[in-house]
Amino acid sequence: MLKVAIVGASGYTGVELLRILHSHPEVAVTCVTSEQSAGRPVSSVFPSLRGRCDIVLENLEPVGIAEKVDIVFTALPHKAAMEVVPTFMKMGKDVIDLSADYRIHDADTYGKWYEPHLNPELLPEAVYGIPELRRAEIAEASLIANPGCYPTSVILGLAPLLKGKVIDPRSIIVDAASGTSGAGRGAKVDNLYCEVNEGFRAYGVGGVHRHIPEIEQELSLLAGSPLNITFTPHLVPMDRGILSTIYSQTAGSVKAADLIALYEAFYDGEPFVRVLPEGVLPSTAHVRGSNFCDIGITVDQRTGRVIVISAIDNLVKGASGQAVQNMNLMCGLPETLGLDLLPVFP
């Protein structure tokens, strides 16, 4: 039985980790931390856990935590994670970091989009944790940079096209819409009910969203050369889910049926990627609460553009579910263990 710590358990990704790991047959969550709620049962912070998970939240003391667990999930904001991850690593613990701190390979790029990196020497050790693309590397890693939610939906949506050199990599435009849980649990005026309800708005417009360098880094690796994208995120009045609509120009004449066959071959055997039939498009309602990524593909024959639509639950495949998938690979467990989560519908 693996002993697991969740560092930063009072946010949405933290409680989602607790929900998933509670049903994992090979895991015991033995430590959960929260600076704001230390000393309280986690079920007092999240009443949904009442009677099933009443473990008491602790203060964040990395050495003490490392002494009593086998693996650590860090569900902290950026910067806070890189302040504690080195201690866990030095004490020989495998770490799955859900922040942005180890996703970007280049320290200067990270510094440009976030702030100076505190331990750039760890960046080469961190494996970007998309199992569908990095399964062998993840299995050998000690530090996983769990991907962001938007990047997961975009990268899985584009990987077959870029690897297959079907599209012009300079032509990529992404419109992505997320539920409000993607902004975290902290109190913000922009996320109040009256600010969000009955509205639909873009934000981070003009190439300034912090997920852009992460997306471009991974897409460039798939394409085999550097590329830039136009990425515009949107906030929609729902709790969870991401729908990414991805546009790109084809290198020649293509049919939707041929592209679907390409995707089916690329993701053959993947337990959590569902390529939809021609004429069927994804909905966030059909992946809610699950670790699935649903992908639909069509072609605008008038303009020669491929349109890919991908849907994920931002808290599961976009965060905590993918983190557990990575843990399974790191620990030599069946990849789907604890993740047989049917979507919640309606």
From Swiss-Prot:
Q: Tell me one GO biological process term.
A: L-arginine biosynthetic process
Q: Name one GO cellular component term.
A: cytoplasm
Q: Where in the cell is it found?
A: Cytoplasm
Q: What is its EC number?
A: 1.2.1.38
Could you tell me which pathway this protein works in?
Answer: Amino-acid biosynthesis; L-arginine biosynthesis; N(2)-acetyl-L-ornithine from L-glutamate: step 3/4
Could you list this entry's UniProt keywords, alphabetically sorted. Answer: Amino-acid biosynthesis, Arginine biosynthesis, Cytoplasm, NADP, Oxidoreductase
Enzyme kind, highest EC tier: oxidoreductase
Its recorded reaction(s) are: N-acetyl-L-glutamate 5-semialdehyde + phosphate + NADP(+) = N-acetyl-L-glutamyl 5-phosphate + NADPH + H(+)
> What would be an example GO MF term here?
NADP+ binding
Q: Which residues form the active site?
A: 149
The main location class comes to: cytoplasm
Protein origin, superkingdom: Bacteria
The similarity comment for this entry is: Belongs to the NAGSA dehydrogenase family. Type 1 subfamily.
Q: By its UniProt entry, which PANTHER family does this protein fall under?
A: N-ACETYL-GAMMA-GLUTAMYL-PHOSPHATE REDUCTASE, CHLOROPLASTIC-RELATED, N-ACETYL-GAMMA-GLUTAMYL-PHOSPHATE REDUCTASE, CHLOROPLASTIC-RELATED-RELATED
What is the recorded function of this protein according to its Swiss-Prot or TrEMBL entry?
Answer: Catalyzes the NADPH-dependent reduction of N-acetyl-5-glutamyl phosphate to yield N-acetyl-L-glutamate 5-semialdehyde.
This protein is called what?
A: N-acetyl-gamma-glutamyl-phosphate reductase
Organism, scientific name: Geobacter sp. (strain M21)
> What is the gene name?
argC
